A protein has these predicted regions:
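Alpha-helical residues within the helix-turn-helix
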Residues: 24-25, 42, 63
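Short alpha-helical "packing" element that flanks the helix-turn-helix/winged-helix DNA-binding module
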Residues: 6-13, 65
Length: 91
């Protein structure tokens, strides 16, 4: 099963291409970033990044997941927005 927190870490790592920068952005340590990505790769049964001398680069599977994860993120934000607005109108 895919964990939303793992996807959030994946999105940050895809954006920054650095575990340190992704961790700083999410306010978690670099080791946690690595563990979350490893858990996601294990859940999916596939590596998501190629490790190069220039850092981390999304591979083909990672690029597919990135598109889908962005859609999930947008949907979650929309759910939060619509339920928050509804809660405020019912108070």
């Amino acid at each position: 099963m895919i964990d939303w927190d793992d996807l959030r870490v994946f999105l940050a790592l895809a954006k920054f291409a650095s575990q340190r920068s992704a961790g700083k952005y999410l306010e978690i340590d670099q080791a946690t970033v690595g563990r979350r990505i490893k858990a996601l790769e294990t859940a999916l049964g596939s590596k998501l990044f190629d490790r190069t001398s220039d850092g981390l680069v999304l591979n083909g599977t990672g690029q597919i997941l990135l598109r889908q994860a962005k859609q999930v993120e947008d949907q979650i934000l929309e759910i939060e927005k619509s339920t928050s607005a509804r809660d405020q109108t019912h108070q």
